[in-house]
């Protein structure tokens, strides 16, 4: 790998694809295991070894990683010895900073207190619990394998193990989900005591079970206006409870924002490792095949070629658009300094487009000393930062971003 002088990644996402079954909304690259306990014998161990070989091929020459994230799939299905092997490889070849955030996704019904203790012994210090909903009927409709009793057992294990830094995931806009269901899930989530809560709006991904049902008219998802009300209610309940709404879907207690995901939102480089994972290195985004056999073939070819960084560099315009799209997910918004090589013409186009929405109160602009600017004060010289209003601007963010992208792309 030719490391050159580009900025090396300080984060690594590691994909653990194993799942007991595929949820009806899921289009992630997974490997369905059924309900048997996994061991490192056979294909599970083969996958772990493949990921370790990919890690060894990175030839990292930068600073130790600041964040490591085990996502999936269901990482809590992988035996702890498998996680240990991967973490040892990460530390050996990429380095892990002493104060690194090391996260793992865990699902109810796939771990106990002993397992949590094992994770802590490995240095894992942040846990993301995939609850999604507290109502058994909604969980069943989504094809989730767990139920409310599994959630309660998971929360008990977390409490007994004195896990302090953990997050709880919820989904809004589920089939047959009512306002009462959503309020109950928020209330129960707060009572569980996480330091971080993620609220994701359901997206009907192509070729998923939900997508096929929707095309046949068999899926009763809430209409967009009700989903918007769910979003407003979640924002109100969680912020009133003391959570900081720092990203479109994410809320954290002070000091508990997810450090790893902020790498993505700031459009900074990162390693993606394992089946279906995507990397952003040296200005290049590239993914791996989404099946195990495809990934293994790709890995052998990549190793035989000397571990190059594949793909073409993102163009300056693409980089600018990605930085805007990702950065504006953060409620703090974007500063000019965070936009790569933005010129005066582009600044003027960005401001002209954004201020055209100003009378709808969907955006805010800030100058020096973080002072909010009135609409007639917004110039390329006075504006230092801009963001969506919360929650209304966020709800219309797709419309605003579409107009922004059209304005910036018209000369290309």
From Swiss-Prot:
The lineage of its organism: Bacteria, Bacillati, Cyanobacteriota, Cyanophyceae, Synechococcales. One of its GO terms (cellular component) is cytoplasm. PANTHER family: COPROPORPHYRINIGEN III OXIDASE, RADICAL S-ADENOSYL METHIONINE DOMAIN-CONTAINING PROTEIN 1, MITOCHONDRIAL. Keywords: 2Fe-2S, Chaperone, Cytoplasm, Heme, Iron, Iron-sulfur, Metal-binding, S-adenosyl-L-methionine. It holds the Pfam family Radical_SAM. SMART domains: Elp3. One of its GO terms (molecular function) is 2 iron, 2 sulfur cluster binding. One of its GO terms (biological process) is porphyrin-containing compound biosynthetic process. This is Heme chaperone HemW. Its cofactor is [4Fe-4S] cluster. [2Fe-2S] cluster binds at residues 19, 23, 26. Might carry two S-adenosyl-L-methionine binding sites with only one binding to the iron-sulfur cluster.
